[in-house]
């Protein structure tokens, strides 16, 4: 077996891991674009020659979830190379592409329309997997397990070949609504592990308290008690956040939960998949905003509301209209996503100003805390190696409170151990 970390050993996002079997089967786990705002002006794989060289001879690509820093190059992969992702993950991205297509249609941008249609066709050709059900690419076996993350339908992967068992965590956390299931998976299903490839996004955060999604929900409820009119700016696909927000709003009788058509489509996708397993993820009563819905506007002014917003021309029209009708002292914007976007995006700063002077920052990470990383390493206790990825170059995995024998297994450079070749870029 050979394990290559093409990218991710010294950066967050854009991770690319390759696993080769002795028989010559080669798979990639994630093929994502660098995160926006990074020091690199361009992603080197934006160059078709570099991407072509990377995927030459690859037997299949498995995506742990649908964030762009894991999935970003999917549409540039030749059809001959099979690509795999969770079924719900695929449908969530199809919803995003459908919304982009609607915008392109309205602006009559032919080249953009064709590009989006092509991406959708490539995504529809994906092979989908289900948590707990094994599939194979050549002689490499893969079994995905659901994990909590800020992207719904995220998975860690158990990968087996040449008599070795490798766990790739993808992105995960314990402080999401379903995060408590992680320990059960680690204890029951991931035994006798040889190699652990784990994210380390939060390594440099120290041991500070990281809020749980339940705490976030409680903070939202408190704000809804203080303010009648609550706008929330967050990712349209952060379903834990949106489900908690919906549940918080439901405690205030008569208050509509308002969104646009696209967001409601995502709610329907969430309900159809995750709603089968938990009522928390049933969001079937959202009301779609329109300037023509005068009765809805009257109800919002009378009862108050929670409205999920994004920065685009349609929402700007709606906000400009609504802010003329609302009492500013009873109105607040809850900013519930990465704070750095406010520093990086001038347009977002302008959008936020539309809501007046009341703003609250209510957010938590989608990634494993140091405590969770320690638990993963300790419970899996890999026999051969621990490979930290998806981490800042300055972060120190050895600063975790794990046993010395586990620290001895942390690999940050190329080597060969117990018949496994490690190549780390």
Describe every region a protein language model picked out.
Residues 11-14, 18-63, 72-76, 85-121, ...:
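Pre-active-site segment of Zn-dependent metallo-hydrolases
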Residues 205-330, 389:
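Hard-cation-handling environments
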Residues 1-3, 26:
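Extreme N-terminal starter segment of soluble prokaryotic enzymes
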Residues 7, 28-31, 58-69, 83-87, ...:
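Active-site neighborhood of phospho(di)ester-bond hydrolases with catalytic His/Asp-centered motifs
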Residues 27, 33-35, 93-154, 159-215, 231, 270-296, ...:
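Metallo-beta-lactamase
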Residues 11, 251, 285-425:
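C-terminal regulatory/interaction regions
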Residues 4, 12, 18-22, 131-189:
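Catalytic core of the metallo-beta-lactamase
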């Amino acid at each position: 077996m050979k394990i290559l970390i093409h990218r991710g050993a010294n950066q967050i996002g854009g991770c690319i891991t390759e696993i080769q079997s002795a028989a010559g089967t080669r798979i990639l786990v994630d093929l994502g674009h660098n995160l926006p705002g990074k020091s690199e002006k361009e992603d080197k794989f934006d160059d078709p020659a570099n991407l072509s060289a990377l995927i030459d001879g690859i037997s299949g690509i498995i995506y742990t979830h649908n964030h762009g820093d894991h999935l970003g190059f999917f549409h540039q992969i030749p059809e001959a190379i099979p690509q795999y992702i969770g079924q719900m993950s695929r449908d969530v991205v199809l919803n995003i592409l459908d919304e982009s297509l609607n915008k392109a249609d309205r602006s009559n941008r032919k080249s953009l329309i064709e590009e989006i249609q092509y991406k959708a066709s490539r995504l529809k050709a994906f092979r989908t997997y289900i948590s707990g059900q094994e599939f194979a690419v050549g002689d490499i076996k893969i079994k995905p397990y659901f994990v909590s993350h800020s992207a719904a339908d995220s998975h860690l992967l158990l990968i087996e070949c040449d008599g070795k068992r490798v766990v790739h965590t993808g992105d995960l956390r314990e402080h999401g609504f379903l995060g408590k299931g992680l320990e059960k998976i680690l204890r029951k299903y991931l035994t006798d592990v040889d190699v652990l490839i784990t994210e380390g996004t939060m390594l440099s955060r120290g041991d500070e308290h990281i809020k749980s999604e339940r705490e976030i929900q409680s903070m939202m409820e408190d704000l809804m008690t203080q303010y009648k009119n609550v706008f929330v700016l967050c990712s349209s696909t952060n379903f834990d956040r949106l489900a908690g927000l919906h549940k918080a709003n439901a405690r205030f009788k008569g208050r509509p939960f308002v969104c646009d058509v696209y967001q409601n489509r995502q709610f329907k996708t969430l309900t159809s998949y995750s709603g089968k397993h938990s009522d928390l993820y049933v969001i079937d009563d959202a009301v779609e905003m329109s300037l023509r819905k005068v009765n809805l506007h009257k109800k919002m002014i009378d009862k108050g509301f929670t409205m999920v917003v994004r920065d685009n021309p349609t929402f700007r029209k709606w906000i400009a209209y609504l802010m003329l009708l609302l009492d500013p002292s009873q109105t607040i914007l809850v900013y519930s996503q990465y704070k750095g976007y406010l520093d990086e995006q001038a347009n977002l700063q302008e959008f936020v100003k539309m809501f007046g002077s009341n703003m609250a920052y209510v957010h938590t990470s989608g990634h494993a805390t140091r405590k969770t990383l320690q638990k993963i390493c300790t419970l899996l206790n890999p026999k051969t190696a621990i490979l930290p990825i998806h981490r800042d170059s300055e972060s120190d995995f050895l600063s975790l409170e794990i046993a010395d024998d586990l620290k001895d297994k942390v690999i940050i450079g190329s080597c060969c151990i117990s018949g496994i070749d490690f190549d780390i870029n």
